[in-house]
Amino acid sequence: MYGWVNLDKPCGMSSALAVNLVKRILNVKKAGHAGTLDPLASGVLPIAIGEATKVMPYAVDVIKSYLFTVQWGEQRTTDDAEGEIVDKSDMIPCVENIKKIIPDFIGLLKQVPPSFSAVHVNGVRAFELARSGQDVNLSSRFVDVLELKLLSFDVENNKADFYLSCRKGVYVRSIARDLGIKLGCLGYVTKLQRVRVGCFRKKNAITLEMLKTLYSTNCKSSYLLPLWYVLQDIKHLNNFFSELEIKKLKNGQNIELNNLYVIRNCDICYVSTGNVPVAICSIVNSVVRPVRIFNVRGLVF
């Protein structure tokens, strides 16, 4: 079995546990997720099954979108509801001031990850140091925020809902923290839902319970997306090469194209035969070089 599960991860579960549960449900040995989702967050968690794990890099460096709620008035150690209160503010922001500073959080900007994060510090994850009581001083790094919108503001409960679209590496908790600091009212995330990871969308995601039910029907197309689902933005060559050439690619050998082939150069392409995955290849000066070879015998469905 190989392909992708577009999982709707529940709140309160780690991404690693979600992967293990999917492996258990589908009875597979090899699986991995494309981008960690915090335990307190819910939503889209793409999980690669079997040979699809070889194309996971193409599902990581993609646009991601979130819906999140910020509670104003407090700063917490984890920048979310799990942490301890470290500071308070009586100030209540207004819609006008929130909208006024939003442009400062769009584009290429420097961001300091939360102390409780998976960022490595001298080979140790930051959250492990923070949990042991050590001071964690993380360096800022450049991140790319494409869009940030204020969706609603609950004055009575002093909280606001936002929509965020960004590239990899952005911490929503850091966005909430920095919004609160800039407004002078402090803030932390109380609710976080990921609604998009590249081509994976929340509206098409399935829960673990749904996966169990669909798996029992023995209809793979109802819960498993094809391996090439994350390769839609790269060139696809299906039934392009001869049987002998396909055999060479599968054995890791290069192919030299003759004058009959139109393609001369291609940074990266996906090669298949009869829509069965063969390899990820590069083509330079009419030489096809297999970069990733898929060990599959037939279609997933």
UniProtKB/Swiss-Prot annotation:
BP GO terms, sorted: mRNA pseudouridine synthesis; tRNA pseudouridine synthesis
Active site (UniProt): D38
Enzyme Commission number(s) of this protein: 5.4.99.25
Keywords tagged on the record: Isomerase, tRNA processing
A Pfam cross-reference name: TruB_N
Gene3D superfamilies in UniProt: Pseudouridine synthase
Gene Ontology molecular function terms on file: RNA binding; tRNA pseudouridine(55) synthase activity
InterPro entries, per database record: PsdUridine_synth_cat_dom_sf, PsdUridine_synth_N, tRNA_psdUridine_synth_TruB, TruB_C
Catalysed reaction equations from the record: uridine(55) in tRNA = pseudouridine(55) in tRNA
Family of the protein in this entry: Belongs to the pseudouridine synthase TruB family. Type 1 subfamily.
Function of the protein: Responsible for synthesis of pseudouridine from uracil-55 in the psi GC loop of transfer RNAs.
Full protein name: tRNA pseudouridine synthase B
Source species of the chain: Ehrlichia canis (strain Jake)
